[in-house]
Amino acid sequence: MLSLRQSIRFFKPATRTLCSSRYLLQQKPVVKTAQNLAEVNGPETLIGPGAKEGTVPTDLDQETGLARLELLGKLEGIDVFDTKPLDSSRKGTMKDPIIIESYDDYRYVGCTGSPAGSHTIMWLKPTVNEVARCWECGSVYKLNPVGVPNDDHHH
């Protein structure tokens, strides 16, 4: 039995040293770093190129991810996270709600009443299917989806 163990231990499966599929799998795809919002095409394009040797990096050189997306937007004068305050000049009603735009199927909204600051912030969550009504002042918020429709395609 000892000789059988030793022969199994020395058995090595044959490997192909030159294989085109192995070469293709080891190749890294070339990804261009986005220099403006129009060039953003997924998270891999939101990685900064880094500073050239011997120079001090700028924010544009080293920002990555959402911080880079926000910086590219600010350079073009676009608020990518839509942080402007909601319309508080009126109360939303069921017939005429305050419209909230969102790229997702829900959004968190902080209601402070009408006029603004009438009550403490009440956090609401309007969805695509339901409006949200403030418990304090009764103002109604409705979601307007502006994003790409979900095709429910799973990999």
From Swiss-Prot:
Residues annotated to bind Zn(2+): C111, H119, C134, C137
Residue(s) carrying Phosphothreonine: T55
Chief place of localization: mitochondrion
GO biological process: mitochondrial cytochrome c oxidase assembly; mitochondrial electron transport, cytochrome c to oxygen; proton transmembrane transport
InterPro entries given in the database record: Cyt_c_oxidase_su5b, Cyt_c_oxidase_su5b_sf
Keyword Metal-binding listed: yes
PROSITE patterns: COX5B_1, COX5B_2
Pathway: Energy metabolism; oxidative phosphorylation
Stored Gene3D superfamilies: Cytochrome c oxidase, subunit Vb
Keyword terms: Membrane, Metal-binding, Mitochondrion, Mitochondrion inner membrane, Oxidoreductase, Phosphoprotein, Transit peptide, Zinc
Subcellular location: Mitochondrion inner membrane
Protein's membrane topology: Peripheral membrane protein
The organelle targeting sequence, given as a residue range: 1-25
Family per similarity comment: Belongs to the cytochrome c oxidase subunit 5B family.
Annotated function: Component of the cytochrome c oxidase, the last enzyme in the mitochondrial electron transport chain which drives oxidative phosphorylation. The respiratory chain contains 3 multisubunit complexes succinate dehydrogenase (complex II, CII), ubiquinol-cytochrome c oxidoreductase (cytochrome b-c1 complex, complex III, CIII) and cytochrome c oxidase (complex IV, CIV), that cooperate to transfer electrons derived from NADH and succinate to molecular oxygen, creating an electrochemical gradient over the inner membrane that drives transmembrane transport and the ATP synthase.
Subunit (UniProt): Component of the cytochrome c oxidase (complex IV, CIV), a multisubunit enzyme composed of 12 subunits. The complex is composed of a catalytic core of 3 subunits COX1, COX2 and COX3, encoded in the mitochondrial DNA, and 9 supernumerary subunits COX4, COX5A (or COX5B), COX6, COX7, COX8, COX9, COX12, COX13 and COX26, which are encoded in the nuclear genome.
Protein name: Cytochrome c oxidase subunit 4, mitochondrial
Species this chain originates from: Saccharomyces cerevisiae (strain ATCC 204508 / S288c)
